[in-house]
Structures are given as structure tokens and as C-alpha cells.
Amino acid sequence: MSRPRIGAAAAITQLEGWAIAPNHKDAIVKTFRFDDFNQAFGFMTRVALMADKLDHHPEWFNVYNRVEVLLTTHDADGVTDLDLTLAKFMDSAA
């Protein structure tokens, strides 16, 4: 069963530094920067453990000290409370 959509516009009002994804139906994006690759990879590891617990996984891209993240709930075809929960966790883990 799909979760109800809250929408990207509503989600970013509750988050710091997140934006509506360009060229995407309903998603939020953020780029995290760290001192080095080790910190970026540590962040990704912490987020991966939480994502597994939530059974909700980000689309992300990593180059050296930068992690670009896109969150959306595919079966809801947009942003849901799962995306908001994972985004808030990412902000606290960064």
C-alpha cells in the first residue's frame, strides 16, 4: 500500500537546505559536503543503515567529499513522510 504524498513543496518548508528537484515530478534534493572522502563515506554508511530500517532508500551520487541526494517515494509517485524522515536523519547525520 502506498503512503500519502505530502509533496516536495510542503516538505522543503520543514527542512534546512533542501530544494525541489529540477526535472523530476515530485522529489527533494540536497548536496552534502564534507572535509574528505572518509567523512562522506561515513555519512553514507550511517544513512544506509537507517534507510534499511525504514525500507526506504535514497538515490545518491558520491564524488570525493560530496554526496548529492534525491529523495522520493516511487510507489507514491512523490514525496511522502518517509522522505521527510530520511531527510531529517541525513541532516542530523551530516
UniProtKB/Swiss-Prot annotation:
Write down what this protein is called: Putative pterin-4-alpha-carbinolamine dehydratase
Does the record's keyword annotation contain Lyase? yes
UniProt keyword annotations, A-Z: Lyase
**EC numbers, comma separated:** 4.2.1.96
What are the protein's GO molecular function terms?
A: 4-alpha-hydroxytetrahydrobiopterin dehydratase activity
Matching entries from CDD domains are given as:
PCD_DCoH_subfamily_b (cd00914)
The record's catalysed reaction(s) read: (4aS,6R)-4a-hydroxy-L-erythro-5,6,7,8-tetrahydrobiopterin = (6R)-L-erythro-6,7-dihydrobiopterin + H2O
Gene3D superfamilies attached to this UniProt entry:
Transcriptional coactivator/pterin dehydratase
Q: Which family does it belong to?
A: Belongs to the pterin-4-alpha-carbinolamine dehydratase family.
Q: Which organism is it from?
A: Caulobacter vibrioides (strain NA1000 / CB15N) (Caulobacter crescentus)
* UniProt xrefs under Pfam families: Pterin_4a
Tell me, what is an example of a GO biological process annotation in this record?
tetrahydrobiopterin biosynthetic process
